[in-house]
């Protein structure tokens, strides 16, 4: 029995090692802004939900954190990486949108003030039970009595609000519908840094499902590219420079115009794959998970616009 117990303990230890999170990639942007970059998959039982990026902005007495991870365990893992660059507490969390991989981890930071757009806050408040259930099912991680943090401070739709938080000047931009109806862009004018949420992703197939692609292209053109950007932390993937933003904009713009052209010429949804430059999309992560649903979503969007 003693040997069986030892074997069981070893199996448990081996299992724990097997599912350990990969290290957070910490990138210093400047003396007070750091990117915490994670893997780029979709939440599943292999990655246990660690698929996200976070921006750390070190203020006078505390940290402003952009997004919070998929759940408490992921947030704890990211926080350990944060503590390698500063011991200051997280006092504010800026949530870029309501998708659960970006905010369910906020409950880990019990004393932090959470800010988001009005739409995002409503989605979290009304949908938190299903969000928790879905993330638990997808990742196999049990959250116990998870109680997602509903944002206490909200940004009105379509507004641009300048704020000073912890001595740091920020502009919080609630743009038109892009990745979702309630995206929040966080602009640091003194640093030239933009945290875009999933309005921008890098080497990752974007998710069009909850947004509007034509409007999304407009947000990149009229809002993001109007800023004197030096560095972008996207929702997923490596840091971006201006050339990367323009390349992404052109890809999603071509995607929309290809679907629209086929529709207006009385083609079929099945024709889209024959006309898109699929090779460039295949080179990016999440291709298999996203391409079919993205084509369908944009086809329905174009159909509605021309009904």
Residue spans for each PLM region:
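Metallo-beta-lactamase
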Residues: 62-64, 70-72, 162, 169-254, ...
């Amino acid at each position: 029995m003693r040997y069986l117990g030892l074997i069981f303990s070893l199996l448990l230890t081996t299992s724990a090692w097997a599912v350990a999170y990969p290290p957070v990639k910490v990138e210093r942007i400047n003396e007070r802004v750091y990117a915490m970059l994670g893997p780029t998959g979709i939440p599943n039982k292999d990655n246990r939900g660690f698929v996200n990026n976070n921006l750390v902005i070190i203020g006078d007495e505390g940290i402003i954190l952009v997004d919070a991870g998929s759940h408490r365990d992921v947030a704890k893992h990211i926080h350990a990486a944060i503590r390698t660059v500063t011991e200051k507490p997280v006092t504010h969390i800026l949530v870029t949108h309501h998708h659960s991989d970006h905010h369910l981890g906020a409950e880990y930071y019990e004393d932090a003030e959470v800010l988001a757009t009005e739409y995002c806050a409503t989605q979290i408040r009304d949908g938190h039970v299903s969000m928790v259930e879905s993330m638990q099912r997808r990742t196999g991680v049990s959250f116990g009595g998870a109680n997602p943090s509903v944002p206490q401070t909200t940004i009105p739709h379509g507004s641009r609000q300048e704020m000073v938080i912890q001595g740091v000047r920020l502009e919080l931009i609630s743009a038109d519908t892009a990745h979702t109806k309630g995206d929040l862009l966080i602009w640091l004018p003194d640093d030239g840094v933009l945290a875009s949420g999933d309005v921008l992703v890098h080497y990752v197939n974007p998710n069009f499902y909850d947004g509007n692609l034509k409007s999304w292209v407009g947000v990149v053109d009229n809002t993001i590219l109007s800023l004197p950007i030096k560095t972008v932390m996207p929702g997923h993937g490596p840091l971006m420079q201006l050339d990367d933003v323009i390349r992404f904009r052109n890809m999603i713009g071509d995607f929309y115009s290809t679907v629209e052209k086929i529709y207006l010429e009385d083609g079929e949804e099945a024709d889209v794959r024959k006309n898109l430059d699929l090779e460039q999309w295949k080179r990016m992560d999440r291709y298999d998970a996203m391409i079919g649903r993205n084509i369908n979503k944009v086809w329905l969007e174009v159909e509605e616009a021309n009904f």
